[in-house]
Swiss-Prot record:
Modification type Glutamic acid 1-amide: residues: 89
Species for this entry: Conus imperialis (Imperial cone)
GO cellular component, one term: extracellular region
Tissue specificity annotation: Expressed by the venom duct.
Signal peptide from the UniProt entry: 1-18
Main localization of the protein described in the UniProt heading: secreted
GO molecular-function term, one example from the UniProt record: toxin activity
Name under which the protein is recorded: Conotoxin Im6.2
């Protein structure tokens, strides 16, 4: 009887741990994809308007619903990502 209970508890622990790990991996994938999309979005905006509106990151950030009060590099978190640098360098 005790052995059965121990086996059940062990099985539950294994299942719980596997579930947690799956959730952790899933959230990591989601944020990575989001960051890549954001980097591409910000880079495209910068590339298109760099001659007429240099350093203007306000518009894309407002489009994304981010509060942005100054003209400072609002999207620098995304524009400094690896994907954005690859795009920028060609």
């Amino acid at each position: 009887m005790k052995l059965t209970i121990l086996l059940l508890v062990a099985a539950l622990l294994v299942l719980t741990q596997a579930r947690t790990e799956r959730r952790r991996v899933k959230s990591r994938k989601t944020s990575s994809t989001y960051d890549d999309e954001m980097a591409t979005f910000c880079w495209s905006y910068w590339n298109e308007f760099q001659y007429s509106y240099p350093y203007t990151y306000v518009q894309p950030c407002l489009t994304l619903g981010k509060a942005c009060t100054t003209n400072s590099d609002c999207c620098s978190k995304y524009c400094n990502t690896k994907m954005c640098k690859i795009n920028w360098e060609g």
